[in-house]
């Protein structure tokens, strides 16, 4: 399986967690917590997380990662912009002989990537298929707010671990990806956040015995992080409703299915994500599908956005690599409808 395929699958996994999260379970918490994921989800994590991506290290780590992820080279300007919006941390903690270092993180306020270095005790080989925790990590700020919980304690996001790169026998790079679809007014760059890792596990795939996990430590690692100011910049593209054709009812976007007019009420674009809020008078409360949409850049390049969750009033889309909001000219839909970026604020 290619790195691109596994990245796509990991996004599907994140969405599974988000769907589960929106089921209404309240889990108020202000620190480390054990939120056990179902056995099926753990198995899916293990299947999808085993990949080695050839990336470089240092200040351009995320630039190299996003270039690999998107399958296209990034310009020097893109790399500089990604570097300026990357939080460099470099803090380590040791529990039961295992050192975890939070190296850096990148976010647009809706999707976040945290890069960790895991170092095992000398003489211990990190040769399992998967490392991390089968529990959602807790990320809280100084005010007690959780990155993926709303004020009532309900899930508004999800996340998962990914094995990225092996440095040497007892060192590997891990990536934790998280989505947060918190809809209230909240800034993430004006406060210090604390990332908790509650326990360390390893996992194996075995064709005969199936998948199995083993706990390496019951310790809790915690890291403070402050995101760069301006990383969560958002542009609203809609001043009045725009009508496009979509398929209602969750059916695949295909000419064989009837397409109905859907009013787009809001189109909020960030470096990694686009949130589209919509309404259909014909079938209220029914999910819509607009298929693949594109960000058309000023240089003519069309960058596809991948759907990442559909709800009765909203669709979330993802970019494979952060875009420069100042260089986006318009959003293009499958039916030819265009939402221009008239002014960027």
Give a label for each model feature.
Residues 22, 29-38, 104-111, 267:
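Short, charged N-terminal helix-start/capping segments
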Residues 53-345:
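Alpha-helical, hydrophobic structural elements that either
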Residues 1-31:
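Disordered, charged N-terminal biogenesis/targeting segments of membrane/secreted proteins
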Residues 10-12, 33-70:
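Single-pass transmembrane signal-anchor helices and their membrane-water interface zones
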């Amino acid at each position: 399986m290619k790195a691109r395929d596994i990245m796509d699958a990991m996004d599907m996994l994140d969405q599974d967690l988000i769907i589960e999260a929106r089921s209404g379970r309240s889990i108020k918490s202000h620190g480390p917590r054990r939120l056990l994921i179902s056995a099926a989800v753990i198995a899916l994590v293990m299947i999808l997380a085993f990949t080695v991506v050839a990336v470089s290290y240092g200040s351009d780590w995320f630039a190299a990662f996003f270039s690999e992820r998107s399958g296209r080279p990034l310009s020097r300007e893109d790399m500089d912009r990604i570097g300026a919006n990357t939080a460099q941390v470099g803090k380590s903690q040791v529990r039961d002989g295992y050192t975890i270092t939070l190296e850096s993180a990148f976010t647009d306020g809706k999707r976040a990537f945290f890069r960790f270095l895991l170092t095992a005790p000398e003489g211990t080989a990190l040769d399992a298929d998967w490392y991390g925790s089968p529990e959602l990590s807790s990320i809280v700020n100084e005010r007690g707010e959780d990155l993926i919980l709303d004020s009532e304690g309900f899930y508004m996001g999800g996340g998962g671990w990914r094995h990225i790169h092996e440095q040497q026998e007892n060192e590997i790079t891990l990536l934790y990806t998280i989505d947060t679809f918190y809809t209230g007014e909240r800034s993430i760059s004006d406060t210090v956040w604390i990332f908790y890792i509650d326990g360390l596990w390893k996992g194996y795939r075995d064709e005969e015995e199936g998948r199995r996990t083993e706990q390496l430590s019951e310790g809790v690692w915690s890291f403070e992080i402050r995101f760069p100011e301006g990383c969560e910049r958002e542009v609203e593209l809609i001043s009045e409703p725009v009508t496009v054709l979509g398929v209602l009812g969750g059916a695949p976007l295909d000419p064989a299915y009837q397409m109905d007019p859907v009013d787009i009420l809001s189109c909020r674009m960030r470096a990694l994500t686009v949130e589209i809020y919509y309404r259909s008078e014909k079938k209220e409360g029914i999910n819509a599908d607009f298929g693949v949409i594109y960000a058309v850049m000023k240089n003519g390049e069309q960058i596809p956005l991948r759907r990442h969750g559909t709800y009765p009033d909203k669709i979330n889309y993802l970019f494979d690599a952060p875009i420069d909001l100042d260089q986006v000219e318009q959003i293009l839909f499958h039916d030819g409808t265009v939402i221009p970026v008239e002014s960027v604020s």
